[in-house]
Regions:
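C-terminal, non-catalytic "cap/extension" segments appended to globular domains
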Residues: 3-139
């Protein structure tokens, strides 16, 4: 729901439109109605739910989710494929925020100054989807 709401808002922004709360209310109600259909009644107050999402107003909030997914996937792959993976993971945890994000990621072999961890994550997700499809075909 949040992604659909944001997609519509950012599309309007990219198209050069300006708008206020009433437009945001309209977009939110439309998204909720599209999602829930006639399963529930969407009243006018439901359109205000976008206001309680403080992270909408925080720059780069979606970046933290993406970075977290990429770094955690890199950590999992390092743990799975490296003889020092478990030790490196413990060292990352022991670092306790004493390093920059780049330095922390490097402990588990994720050089986030390059696109390699992102590409590895995309490949991992692609492989996972392929596995799910293969397992589903066996059912």
């Amino acid at each position: 729901l949040e992604a659909a709401f944001q997609r519509k808002v950012y599309t309007l922004i990219e198209e050069g439109e300006t708008f206020g709360a009433s437009k945001l209310n309209s977009i939110m109600k439309e998204v909720l109605t599209d999602f829930w259909g006639d399963a529930i009644e969407i009243d006018d107050d439901a359109a205000l739910t976008w206001m309680r999402q403080a992270h909408y107003y925080m720059g780069l909030y979606s970046y933290t989710y993406s970075a977290g997914l990429v770094i955690s996937t890199a950590g999992y792959l390092h743990l799975k494929h490296s003889e020092t993976g478990a030790e490196d993971w413990l060292n990352l945890l022991k670092s306790g925020g004493s390093k920059t994000p780049l330095e922390s990621a490097m402990i588990i072999g994720a050089d986030i100054s390059t696109d390699k961890p992102l590409r590895d994550t995309i490949q991992f997700l692609s492989d996972t989807v392929d596995q799910i499809i293969a397992y589903s075909a066996e059912l």
